Amino acid sequence: SNAIVGRVAPTPEEDPSFAMYDARHSAIYWRPSTVANATGGQIVDPRSGQILKGEVNMYHNIMELQKNWYFIQVGPLDERAQSLPMPDSLMGRLVEYVVTHEIGHSIGFPHNMKASAMYPADSVRSASFLERMGGSHTATLMDYSRFNYVAQPEDNIPLEYLIPQVGPYDHFGVRWGYSPIPEADTPDDELEILNGWAREQDRYPWLRFTTADAAGSDPEALTEAVGDADAVKSTTYGMRNLERVMNMMLQVTEKPGQSYDELENLYGQAVSQWGRYMGHVTAIVG
């Protein structure tokens, strides 16, 4: 634990020799850009596969993307999202979620789009279940499972549990990728132990995974989905929240004497979210 420590980069006065792009220093870069995205990667020693430097690029407009997603998916569940702009405390938490996902990439973790289908749709409406699973509605931060739109107002889900967190698959990934196996003298000697770890998914389905190569072949490996073990049920819950969003959208965005640009933006986001929900259902039939 505590293997990764974050610090503010030193100033030239504090350390004249420090260079942000030095391969000895992993870094999170804030990019003044209109790009609504973030990326994570690494510089790797080609001789050994060792990661020498992890990099996270946070483009400024990622905050606009997170604001849109959070409002459209769980706005009815969180009063902080029902007034724009959202408070710094919430926006900071949304940025933290993205940074953590990208750090996962920087230490070698690929996406795992199957993880969100490993929890039953009704279970991610249960605060006690979410607490037992580390507070997250998906088994890994490396899924494209954004915010818990399956939860309903009457479920009284803690606000922190609406946002993905480090899950059991992430802990498994760290063990797989970074735990030493002292009894193995060669990589081949590790196989029996690694195969044993892999078989744990037979008992614990939330350790199962899929890869990018399997995209489109598994209806449980969906992007932008929550509770897609039953995509029909989870989409039904999502549509209920989307209807609530539509009912409050004008009140949240309307400002006397101001343009309707934000209303137009969020209305378009709602239509796009409807399309994603429908896509989750149609994936079942191919």
Across the structure, where does each feature detected by a protein language model lie?
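Metzincin-family zinc-dependent endopeptidase catalytic domain
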Residues: 1-106, 133-136, 147-150
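Residue-level preference for alpha-helix termini and adjacent loops
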Residues: 43, 112, 140-141
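Alpha-helix termini
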Residues: 62, 66, 114-117, 121
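N-terminal pre-domains immediately preceding structured catalytic cores
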Residues: 80-88, 115, 122, 126
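Catalytic Zn2+-binding segment of zinc metalloproteases
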Residues: 103-119
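Conserved catalytic/binding loops enriched for acidic/polar residues
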Residues: 116-286
